[in-house]
């Protein structure tokens, strides 16, 4: 019994130790897409049935009801622009494929140093981008499954970082 309690205690400690690891990587991926989803307070994963399902739940693109595309540009403060584009094509009994691109462009910024705080005359830019390829399949009239493979890149001045990610989603329509 004592060994069992020690093992449980050790497992609980390791769960808490990882709670904030990586919590700041690619935060631009948390910016929601689509007016309907945003109006619902981003509670859209279970109801995703339009082209924005490429962002919210890849399984949802099976519910679009045809081929679809959407382009979105949001101008934020300080010349920051957020762009999103997505397209999905239904392949009949083979499923549905989609492509999406998220881009956050911070615009041009002046290079400053401790000695030249008003700027050196040089400018640099920063940009985040994610490109996703999605496949979804409707297993039954109520149940769909889908996945997205993403390439993510963040650039600022002369530095960049990139990663690969996978999103997997299921969608069950209960008709309630």
Predicted ranges, named:
Residues 4-15:
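Sec-dependent N-terminal signal peptides
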Residues 18-176:
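Subset of outer-membrane beta-barrel
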């Amino acid at each position: 019994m004592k060994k069992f309690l020690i093992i449980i205690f050790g497992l609980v400690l390791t769960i808490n130790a990882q709670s904030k690891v990586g919590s700041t990587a690619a935060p631009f991926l948390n910016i929601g897409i689509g007016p309907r989803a945003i109006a619902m307070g981003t509670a859209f994963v279970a109801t995703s049935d339009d082209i924005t399902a490429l962002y919210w739940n890849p399984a949802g693109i099976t519910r679009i009801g045809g081929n679809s595309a959407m382009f979105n540009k949001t101008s934020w403060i300080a010349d920051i622009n957020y762009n999103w584009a997505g397209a999905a094509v239904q392949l009949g009994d083979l499923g549905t494929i989609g492509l999406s691109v998220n881009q956050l462009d911070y615009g041009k910024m002046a290079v400053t140093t401790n000695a030249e705080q008003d700027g050196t005359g040089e400018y640099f830019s920063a940009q985040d981008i994610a490109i996703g390829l999605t496949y979804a399949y409707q297993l039954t009239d109520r149940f769909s499954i889908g996945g997205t493979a993403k390439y993510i890149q963040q650039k600022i001045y002369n530095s960049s970082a990139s990663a690969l990610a996978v999103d997997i989603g299921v969608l069950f329509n209960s008709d309630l």
